[in-house]
UniProtKB/Swiss-Prot annotation:
Inhibited by phenylmethylsulfonyl fluoride (PMSF). It comes from Corniculantispora psalliotae. Disulfide bonds join C138-C227, C282-C353. This is Alkaline serine protease ver112. PROSITE patterns: SUBTILASE, SUBTILASE_ASP, SUBTILASE_HIS, SUBTILASE_SER. Residues 111-382 form the Peptidase S8 domain. Residues 1-15 form the signal peptide. Its EC number is 3.4.21.-.
Amino acid sequence: MRLSIIAAVLPLALAAPVAEPEIAPLIEARGAQPIAGKYIVKLKDEAKFGIMNAKSKIPGIERVYENVLNGFSATLSNEELERLRRDPDVESIEQDAIFSINAITQQQGATWGLTRISHRARGSTAYAYDTSAGAGACVYVIDTGVEDTHPDFEGRAKQIKSYASTARDGHGHGTHCAGTIGSKTWGVAKKVSIFGVKVLDDSGSGSLSNIVAGMDFVASDRQSRNCPRRTVASMSLGGGYSAALNQAAARLQSSGVFVAVAAGNDNRDAANTSPASEPTVCTVGATDSNDVRSTFSNYGRVVDIFAPGTSITSTWIGGRTNTISGTSMATPHIAGLAAYLFGLEGGSAGAMCGRIQTLSTKNVLTSIPSGTVNYLAFNGAT
């Protein structure tokens, strides 16, 4: 009897329809300019597909990600796109897009940011800091590049990688951010080592796929560097919401790199901005010298800390200085502060944003919307 039951069921099993494979979601560019025909393909963590297998099947692969993302970027035809969406090893595919720096204005004037983050009250003209000054810590500036020959870096800066058409900083934004982090005159952490990773071109913009490639590079490269007091990544860039960029930022953070990112300059909730909306990184809003939220600064629950961002003077290309504004200028204050605190106290990447919040000066800022922290960065020196 048992054999006859099995025999009766078997034809039904053989006749059952084969389930349609799941189709991987196609994520469109949100709040950013899409790049036609270019995509970021995220593979499942358990994928059997393999990058080498992908290269043999897809001639348009451009960037391969192995650390902060399991996947690659590629130029795809509509046919290749749809074929990949049906591949069981593909988790999602996201349209590549243009992201850009978060600096908005230029004007003459001296910086005040260093004095503000080293005193509880406004009005001081001196920057107070421990002489350890971030020694032994390393900061990667993921930006337009760093002019490492600028004399104010004293030989502690190196431009090491480019995903743009040129390696040098032809814009100035990355050099400015690096100067706020660790230059002799304008820097928060005056003994830190700085590494430039160029992901934005000389107009200040670049593709999402190149930004992720730069982050992937940092996750790998830091393992070969002598950074006994830990590693920081400073990202003064952003655009619309990107799941791929947020995941890359989260994985870079979880790998042991403290990641500071700009909240953005749209005077709106940063929840739809990447990488600012990634909850595990440290998202930075900007203030002016009167302790008012900068008119351009984004806000919202994803913002972790505020720092000086209006009229900040720092290093510039050509061995010069420049005074500009943006959450781009606030972010390197926090990247530099993290390096300073790593050098002074130690600690972990995962705990550093909380440490900066604990140290911060509370409830002195104005024009802070409801639901946004009222925390101004402070280095604890006075």
